[in-house]
């Protein structure tokens, strides 16, 4: 059970919450702050004070005063009218993350909701009732209005949820769990939907997958180094310390550890003086991607604990301030950066695939074919990798450079952060498939070189891979092989655990 405080949530805790289904509870001290802040809202309504989103309309309607008797209707109307999401739903892990992050931001005690609302969000998390939230429709400012409105709907007994493996109406799940839908009161609708929790939840899942995929890329690249009898000198510690990037040094160190007892690597001058960049520069390229990952993790952990709705209430109600913390620009930039960093792992992987299959670049059978000419072997696998890499290049175009004004030009600059976050996740799926192709080719090359000559780590990884796909002894439908390895990487390593050298042993 993980305790939410509004201030201390980490990526490691989110892994447990999203991927292992761990439950959550609220810190009592934080809940007391929620209750105290709610008293301020009640006084504002009772006194008829003009405060945006509490006693006024929204967006362009911020100058329209709302009568006391209409305050509840205002919040309900807000949720229904803003539930304009379209397209396929987010993965359940993302909608679960949205519930968690929305509760966590409310626990900062500046949003003005009742403790009841926070408790309802936590009930959904702990009972694994996950809102069906369409992926498209958010501009990323005023936060993720459309996606979060679909989240808010289910608290009211409206909309759909994923529950016990099925997609059902929210009331089906609520009834079975013995829960009553809530009725929103002043400010609560706005507090539920004004924030960055859709882009951030998707960003967290993307980061978790990206981190493990980056570790996998090092292990798979190490197998390729063996298959091509790569020069180990390029990974010498002195080379990488001379440049000074810690991530580059760490990648080189892990590859040295992976290959320390390999009989397939060579020294410079034995077979050739230098390797191609796709081998020699693995620490420089992969290390740079790790720099991106470290940056993204830092920004996500800030946003996970941020107050992102509007207005915010401070100093016991002395200050009720309209601001713009809902603007998703920090996450938009981070997700666009993640797209580029991960796309490069696929770019360099595809070049290693080419070196494994091109007979002009190695002494292996052409296209790793068991009978070149009659059988094409891995020829079209390289085509598939090239296609995925090119698709990533289009997806990597920064969403954050775009902005379209909305709400009659009141909201005249937006982040497009949710688009960036969604595209980052798509890129990571493509990267994993490219790496799967590289692994298939590297395993085949290892067989030609002699499996007994592989390092202890890569040999273990090879045997695990061969449990998923057989050797290429004849042409067959290779798309099945690619998907099998992709699924195996994702379910056994990618989002379940951090892969280090010992994980393959």
UniProtKB/Swiss-Prot annotation:
PTM text: Contains an active site 4-methylidene-imidazol-5-one (MIO), which is formed autocatalytically by cyclization and dehydration of residues Ala-Ser-Gly.
Chain positions of cross-link 5-imidazolinone (Ala-Gly): 141-143
Protein location: Cytoplasm
InterPro entries: Aromatic_Lyase, Fumarase/histidase_N, HutH, L-Aspartase-like, Phe/His_NH3-lyase_AS
Keywords: Cytoplasm, Histidine metabolism, Lyase
MF terms (GO), sorted A to Z: histidine ammonia-lyase activity
CC annotations in GO: cytoplasm
Keyword hit for Methyltransferase: no
Catalysed transformations (reactions): L-histidine = trans-urocanate + NH4(+)
HAMAP family linked to this entry: His_ammonia_lyase
PANTHER family reported in the protein's UniProt record: HISTIDINE AMMONIA-LYASE
Record-stated family: Belongs to the PAL/histidase family.
Protein name from the UniProt record: Histidine ammonia-lyase
Name of the gene this protein is made from: hutH
């Amino acid at each position: 059970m993980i305790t939410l405080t509004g201030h201390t949530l980490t990526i490691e805790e989110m892994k447990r919450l999203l991927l292992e289904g761990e439950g959550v509870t609220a810190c009592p001290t934080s809940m007391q702050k929620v209750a105290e802040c709610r008293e301020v809202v009640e006084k504002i309504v009772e006194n008829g004070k003009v405060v945006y989103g509490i006693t006024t309309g929204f967006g362009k309607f911020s100058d329209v005063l709302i009568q006391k008797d209409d305050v509840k209707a205002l919040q309900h109307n807000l949720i229904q009218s803003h539930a304009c999401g379209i397209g396929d739903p987010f993965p359940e892990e993302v909608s679960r993350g949205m519930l968690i992050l929305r509760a966590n931001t409310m626990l900062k005690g500046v949003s003005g909701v009742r403790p009841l609302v926070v408790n309802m969000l936590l009930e959904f998390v702990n009972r694994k009732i996950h809102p069906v939230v369409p992926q498209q429709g958010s501009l990323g400012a005023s936060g993720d209005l459309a996606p979060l409105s679909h989240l808010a709907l289910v608290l009211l007994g409206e909309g759909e949820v994923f529950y016990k493996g099925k997609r059902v109406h929210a009331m089906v799940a609520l009834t079975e769990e013995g829960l009553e839908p809530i009725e929103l009161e002043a400010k609560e609708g706005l507090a539920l939907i004004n924030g960055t929790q859709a882009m951030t939840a998707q960003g967290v899942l993307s980061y978790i997958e990206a981190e493990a995929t980056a570790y996998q890329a090092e292990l798979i690249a190490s197998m390729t180094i063996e298959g091509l009898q790569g020069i180990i000198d390029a990974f010498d510690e002195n080379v990488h310390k001379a440049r000074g990037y810690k991530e580059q040094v760490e990648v080189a160190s892990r590859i040295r550890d992976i290959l320390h007892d390999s009989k397939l690597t060579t020294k410079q001058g034995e077979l050739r003086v230098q390797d191609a960049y796709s081998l020699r520069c693995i620490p420089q390229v992969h290390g740079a991607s790790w720099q991106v990952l470290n940056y993204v993790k830092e920004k996500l952990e800030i946003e996970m604990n941020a107050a992102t709705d509007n207005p915010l209430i401070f100093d016991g109600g002395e200050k009720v301030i309209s601001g713009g913390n809902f603007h998703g620009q920090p996450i938009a930039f981070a997700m666009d950066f993640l797209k580029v960093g991960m796309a490069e792992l696929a770019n360099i992987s595809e070049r290693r695939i080419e070196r494994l299959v091109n007979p002009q670049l190695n002494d292996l059978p052409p296209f790793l074919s068991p009978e070149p000419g009659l059988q094409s072997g891995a020829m079209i696998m390289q085509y598939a990798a090239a296609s995925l890499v090119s698709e990533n290049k289009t997806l990597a175009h920064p969403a954050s450079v775009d902005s379209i004004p909305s709400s009659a030009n009141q909201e005249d600059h937006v982040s497009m952060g949710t688009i960036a976050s969604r595209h980052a996740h798509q890129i990571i799926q493509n990267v994993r498939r490219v790496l799967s192709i590289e692994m298939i080719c590297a395993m085949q090359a290892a067989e030609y070189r002699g499996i007994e000559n592989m390092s202890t780590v890569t040999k273990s990884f090879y045997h695990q891979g061969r449990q998923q796909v057989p050797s290429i002894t004849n042409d067959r439908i290779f798309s099945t092989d690619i998907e099998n390895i992709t699924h195996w990487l994702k379910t056994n390593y990618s989002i379940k655990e951090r892969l280090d050298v010992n994980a393959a042993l």
